[in-house]
Amino acid sequence: QGDSNHENIAPSPVSVTISSREITPAITLSGSGLTEANGVYSYIYDGTAKTPTVTVTDNGDEISDTEYSVSYRDNVNAGTATVTVSDNNGGNYIVNGTATFEITKKAPAFTPPAGIPGLQYNGEAQELVTAGVCYEGTVVYSVNNGNYSTAIPVGTAVGTYTIDYKVLGDANHSDTVPATLTVEIG
């Protein structure tokens, strides 16, 4: 409504567009079995896909999970896994980012070798132990501080033999610390 110095103007619609705000999200991971130390998240390998819960924040404010989708890559075997947060169109925010977590190798389960008791000298090479069994790596042996080998240790001469053994883990299982047993040929 105009006054004596201004004309009347008819109202007209005004169009306003509110754009989504692009953020650089802080991504936090959580979930059963997930540990965090010094900013590094990790699980221990167990053969299952790891899908930690993802929380996204912007300057400390949590962003609704309807704003983004989550996908996982390399999240089954030991190594570094990636969590990708991808924007869902039409929200209040544009949210894109990644986080990583580690899947650490698990200690292998194995049956250790056992020394064969009562061995007597017979002039021929004799196996000194029953074989260790491991399906999550390879059992290797060393006789009297020699090189490690997958061959079952043998001895011929009368005496005491020191057998060191360990498991060389596979891609998802760690190596074990060497252990020692002694066997005698009388």
Regions found by a protein language model. Give the residues of each.
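Solvent-exposed beta-strand/loop surfaces, strongest in extracytoplasmic domains of secreted
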Residues: 1-186
